[in-house]
């Protein structure tokens, strides 16, 4: 029996894929996108798996559904999907979704050049520049970001002691700067990152309490951000973000950049008004900026922004037929 056909706009944000699903998204229960996210995970996670996992997706695939706004002041709402689940917030996903939606005529802003978007992590403001039919760039004013844990030494089996910070930028990140047991991003292979990241995340998740003060459904270390030397002109720092089971973000990562800004602000290395050009593992760049200081519960926090670009790569119609033994996807590792 046919389960559904999903029309999609495929794109990438600075090298990382975004699949905007334009039809077939379910009617979700809940007043907020946080509540709708929980309903999607409970009732419709087969859609995510079918569209993100092989054979219709791949290890790096991420995507989004565009929904009507939950708030009176918003233009739209976004539900993020990827191989690891439904993230509360996704920076590269927002940039790609907004670009694809505007260029495809799926989103009409109340005020050209500006958008207000409801996401599971809260509400974000967006600015963009469009020349003719093409969106040149998108700037996200993200949810508040803060440093949750500082200078925590974890014992990583097989690697040894590793000092990390944990910072929130829409998701919780274990941030690893160069040190004795990590010589820096450019001195490790992608295989090294894929090998050690799940172990670091598991230990950090087990030993550190990470629960968002305003939304307890947002909890636990989900990403690992490794830092190192830059390769692109104009970059202030470089990172490789691990997420899911075996994915390394090809973009500089929007929520990761937000988390990095919060970490550097907490350490006194950045101040309000500073920009920070953040580089990905492939050398693509986001421009992060600390817009303002704020609070998240008892934590000192920042209001970060991230500016980047995306390009549409194609359009497709994906059929999910439960007569197919791989209708709901698979993962090899």
Curated annotation (Swiss-Prot):
Substrate binds at residues 91-92, 223, 249, 254-255. Its EC number is 5.1.1.8. InterPro entries: Pro_racemase_fam. The active site is at residues 90, 253. It catalyses: trans-4-hydroxy-L-proline = cis-4-hydroxy-D-proline. It is an enzyme of class 5 (isomerase). It comes from the Bacteria. GO terms for molecular function: 4-hydroxyproline epimerase activity. Belongs to the proline racemase family. This is 4-hydroxyproline 2-epimerase. It comes from Shewanella loihica (strain ATCC BAA-1088 / PV-4). The lineage of its organism: Bacteria, Pseudomonadati, Pseudomonadota, Gammaproteobacteria, Alteromonadales.
